[in-house]
Regions:
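ABC ATPase NBD coupling module
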Residues: 25-42, 60, 68, 190-195
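A short, surface-exposed alpha-helical micro-motif characterized by mixed small hydrophobic
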Residues: 167-169
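Conserved ABC transporter NBD signature motif
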Residues: 13-24
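Short catalytic/signature loops enriched in Gly
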Residues: 10, 91-95, 187-215
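Conserved ABC ATPase "signature" region
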Residues: 23-24, 64, 76-95, 204-205
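A short, proline-enriched helix->beta-strand linker immediately N-terminal to the Walker B motif
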Residues: 119-123
């Protein structure tokens, strides 16, 4: 939320900087940020049931974002929305785009959220626990989609998660956080193989391993 400058009052950014595309966006006005949010920086929130408006169809919510940032008419924006639904693997997109969020399964809602977030081809996608409420099969599908889209579109992804398995499968670089502060950072391979901070070591030791002898 800090990156998007969406912290509710009285919360505020007291110090530091957020450099995006070579510029410190902490100094941006609300008008400047509104042009970036959903356009250059997009976010997938953890709870899809509350992130999607239950009284509007998927089409209405996707088209609004595309019209706002891409300056397209409704017809072109709808075509773009359909293309994105196809990209994330939603079957029968021409029919499902007219569904309400409650008519989608958890995995389908997450796909719709990803499609909406990527509809304006952002440079950065922030994914906050995008697979937490999903079973392992759907989780794997969602992670595959995110990886493929990152490769195809060049979108960078910041993945916020507590799941070390997801990190190992998906990420290149890792920052271990505790109490809102970075404890350790480096490549996933380096930290998993040789964690330096006690908190990182504790996290990795907490993961059950089949190759570890039980005492």
């Amino acid at each position: 939320l800090s990156v998007m400058k969406l912290i509710d009052s009285p919360g505020k950014i007291k110090e530091g900087s957020i450099i995006f595309d070579g510029k410190d966006i902490t100094n941006y006005t609300e008008n400047q940020m509104s042009n970036i949010r959903g356009n250059e920086i997009a976010m997938i929130f953890q709870d899809t049931m509350t992130s999607l408006n239950p009284v509007f169809k998927i089409k209405d919510q996707m088209v609004e974002v595309i019209e706002r940032h891409q300056k397209l008419g409704k017809h072109k924006a709808t075509e773009r929305a359909l293309d994105m639904l196809r990209l994330v693997g939603i079957p029968e997109p021409e029919r499902r785009i007219n569904s309400y969020p409650h008519e989608f399964s958890g995995g389908m809602r997450q796909r719709a959220m990803i499609a909406t977030a990527l509809s304006c081809s952002p440079k950065l996608l922030i994914a906050d626990e995008p697979t937490t409420a999903l079973d392992v099969t759907i989780q794997a599908q969602i992670l595959d989609i995110m990886r493929d889209i990152s490769v195809k579109t060049g979108t960078s992804i910041i993945l916020i998660t507590h799941d070390l398995g997801v990190i190992a499968e998906t990420c290149n670089d890792l920052i271990v956080m505790y109490g809102g502060m970075p404890m350790e950072m480096g490549s996933v391979e380096d930290i998993f193989a040789n964690p330096q901070h006690p908190y990182s070591q504790g996290l990795l030791k907490s993961v059950p391993r089949m190759d570890r002898e039980q005492k």
